[in-house]
UniProtKB/Swiss-Prot annotation:
Protein name: Imidazolonepropionase
Matching InterPro entries: Amidohydro-rel, HutI, Metal-dep_hydrolase_composite, Metal_Hydrolase
Record: residues binding 4-imidazolone-5-propanoate: R87, Y150, H183, E250, S327
Function: Catalyzes the hydrolytic cleavage of the carbon-nitrogen bond in imidazolone-5-propanoate to yield N-formimidoyl-L-glutamate. It is the third step in the universal histidine degradation pathway.
Source organism (scientific name): Bacillus cereus (strain ATCC 10987 / NRS 248)
GO CC annotations on file: cytoplasm
UniProt entry tagged with the keyword Metal-binding: yes
Superkingdom of the organism of origin: Bacteria
GO BP annotations, alphabetical order: L-histidine catabolic process to glutamate and formamide; L-histidine catabolic process to glutamate and formate
Binding, N-formimidoyl-L-glutamate: Y150, N324, G326
Gene Ontology terms for molecular function: imidazolonepropionase activity; iron ion binding; zinc ion binding
Chain residues that bind Fe(3+): H78, H80, H247, D322
Homology family: Belongs to the metallo-dependent hydrolases superfamily. HutI family.
Amino acid sequence: MLDTLLINIGQLLTMDQEDGLLRREAMNTLPVIENGAVGIENGVITFVGTAEEAKGLQAKEVIDCGGKMVSPGLVDPHTHLVFGGSRENEIALKLQGVPYLEILEQGGGILSTVNATKQSSKEELVQKAKFHLDRMLSFGVTTVEAKSGYGLDDETEWKQLEATAQLQKEHPIDLVSTFLGAHAVPKEYKGRSKEFLQWMLDLLPEMKEKQLAEFVDIFCETGVFSVEESKEFLLKAKELGFDVKIHADEIDPLGGAEAAAEIGAASADHLVGASDKGIEMLANSNTVATLLPGTTFYLNKESFARGRKMIDEGVAVALATDFNPGSCPTENIQLIMSIAMLKLKMTPEEVWNAVTVNSSYAINRGDVAGKIRVGRKADLVLWDAYNYAYVPYHYGVSHVNTVWKNGNIAYTRGEQSWSTATI
């Protein structure tokens, strides 16, 4: 007997097409079962099909979804989850048009958050991050990548990674930990970036032994780390058994996209300034292009990543919030979906695949997350919507009704959710 059977699902978005990264036409295709049903037993999906096919199945609990839509739990593959403080004091500078790198030089930006994170205890960081994770869950996210990078010293970086490990045990959302010690060059290492990177590399063996990080990342940008420094650093991390990511071409077209494809990074993230050659190389690689349009929006910039061109050229595109206190302080991945549709010229179908299938591959979770398939974890979202296009179309609010994590209800809007209204 099933534990739970969901029936009367108007649109069941299984996302279950070909295995592997989705590109071109596959990104614009959504496998949808009309009038669907999903069976759950011991936290695992055991039935996926139509309501007609589900007749005769027995379950301890039968949930009538009222003709609404069900999707897999969403995957946010790029966040800076664990940090201290906030940076609303920088809003005035941004409105005045002060460039981010100039704010950084003045001790703001990342360095401001570094100081606040250093001054926070691990428990304070955990409690703050739980608040943000709760919000992410309420937007339908069940798997999240979490970076360190607000320490720039060994003690604080360890503290962030240990906080992430504690959150993994205490919060229902699945976390994927990334070490981003190379997020900026500390003042005491100004002009000595190679020495700083070696210091970061010296931390990796113990980090690997304690399993505190799965990925290593670096901020490859003008005034931070060069392409050659980034490649050398990430290749050494790969030699130690880590998978790697790269903050690439966010501000200037340095060649970060090319570097990511060349070294076989799991993802290249941002890519606002990615060159035509970089896009071509990504298209011919298994590196996911994780685009972060919420950051471009919040920084009030005119030029967004060329998502349309990337998809047309064959790049596997994912979307993420880039949740962080400075350049994208939002947990709302649904808003990111809307911005991607409007500013990156992505179709609703492409947007959905970019926050499920491709985003799961960007963090090496393609075999466990992002799809509704028999044998996978029952990470599901019931939406207060009757079709998938409605979610990115009606922007700025959450359309989530209920979230199941491993077959258990982890979030419900409850009585606040409409039940009799029609769209």
